[in-house]
Structure formats: C-alpha cells, structure tokens
Design a protein with these regions (language model features):
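A short acidic (Asp/Glu
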Residues: 71-73, 83, 165-169
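Terminal substrate-recognition subdomain of acyl/acetyltransferases
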Residues: 1-23, 37-38, 117-118, 122, ...
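A structural signal for short, well-ordered beta-strand segments and their strand-loop junctions
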Residues: 61-62, 79-85, 153-157
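Short intrinsically disordered coil segments
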Residues: 98-102, 141, 199-202
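Conserved acetyl-CoA-binding loop-helix of GNAT-fold acetyltransferases
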Residues: 120-147
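Conserved acyl-donor/pantetheine-binding loop and adjacent beta-alpha core of acyl/acetyltransferases
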Residues: 84-125
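Catalytic micro-motifs at enzyme active sites that drive phosphoryl/nucleotidyl and oxygen chemistry
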Residues: 47-51, 109-112, 142-145
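Short amphipathic alpha-helix that is part of the acyltransferase structural core
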Residues: 2-79
Length: 203
C-alpha cells in the first residue's frame, strides 16, 4: 500500500486485491462489458481514457484469473468485474451535491490530478459478470474508504435495480439530501465512525 500520493496509494491497494486501473485495449473491453451488463448511457472511451491519464484511476477491473488467484503472464484473462473510482476536486464534490456533476462527460475542473488530494470519490458504478467479483470490489471500496481516504465521502448513481439493491443494501448508501436525480452517498469512514460512537453513547 506504499505510494507517494493518495491516488497512488489507492491504486496500490487495488493491486493488492488483484484489481487494476484500466487503459488502452482493456478500456475497450471494459466498456463493452459494462454496456452488456448495465447498458447505455456510459462515459465514452475518450472520457475514460482522459480520466485515467489525469488520475491513473478511473475504471478499475478484475479478471477471471485475478479473481481466482491464478497467474496471467500474458494479461489475456477476460474481465469479470469493474469498479469506477473517480476522485473529485472540491469543486467536483460540490457539483455532485448540487446535481451539477456530469458523470457521462465530467468537467476536467471537477476531477483531481494525480497530485491532488480528493475531496470525494464519484463511483462510475459496479458492473460484474460474477457474484464473487461484486463481493471483491465492494470489499475493496470499503478498504479504500477506511484506510486510505477516511475523510472522503463516496457518491454513486444506480442505473439498474440490482445496482440499487447493492448500493443501498450492502454498502448502505443513502440519497443525497435535496438530490432530484437520485445521487447516493456513502459517508466517509470518519463520519460513519463518529455517528456510530454518538448513537452508541446515546443508547
């Protein structure tokens, strides 16, 4: 989990889960998988590519080999799970809260550079063809939230009923107050811990 910047530490933590940021031909494969699983509209390949170039994150993926702990020296195993991790600037975080963040074509000013500290994380979503991949990616997201960016809220917008059940159930996301487009938020680990301690003390 070593890394010079927060975004590097996120990428290294993901690698410990056999999950990796996608670029090049892997992005083409990933977008095709996502379209098949959740449908359009999705961010374009060009958008996914510049988000990766800017952050070295964006769309993270796990392959069948990675999920099964098998070697894949030629990097040829197909993808079976995707997790979008888009780090937000302060302006981007505020835009999400105001329903002004464009998840399909985000403004560069809303997305961190690799050197910046994220004010929040927008999840492009979770798309999986294997149930085990969903569990792995949720666990990765929770690990990142707790151990690497404990002060940052996470946001997502569910596009399928299954996605809504996962986000509201397992991950316990709730609708951002005042959101008219159903933006969901998972409070930062620090906020969640403070709330737990407060409610336990009041019990």
């Amino acid at each position: 989990m070593q890394g010079r910047t927060t975004l590097e530490r996120i990428a290294r933590a993901a690698a410990d889960f056999d999950v990796h940021a996608l670029s090049g031909s892997r992005l083409i494969e990933a977008r095709s998988l996502a379209v098949g699983l959740v449908g359009e509209p999705l961010a374009s390949l060009e958008t996914m590519a510049w988000v990766y170039d800017r952050t070295k994150l964006g769309l993270l993926g796990v392959t069948y080999a990675g999920l099964n702990g098998e070697p894949d020296p030629k990097d040829s195993s197909p993808l079976c799970g995707l997790l979008g991790v888009v780090p937000l600037t302060i302006a981007g975080n505020q835009a999400v809260l105001e329903d002004a963040f464009n998840a399909i074509s985000p403004a560069p000013a809303h997305i961190c550079t690799s050197e910046e500290e994220p004010a929040g994380i927008f999840g492009w979503g979770i798309a999986v063809s294997r149930h085990e991949a969903a569990r792995l990616l949720v666990n990765l997201g929770m690990f990142i939230s707790e151990h690497i960016i404990p002060t940052a809220d996470w946001y997502m917008r569910a596009v399928t009923d299954d996605g809504a059940r996962l986000l509201k159930g397992r991950m316990k996301l709730t609708v951002v107050e005042g959101s008219k487009i159903g933006t969901l938020r998972m409070p930062s680990h620090q906020k969640a811990e403070a709330f737990f301690l407060q409610t336990r003390g009041a019990a």
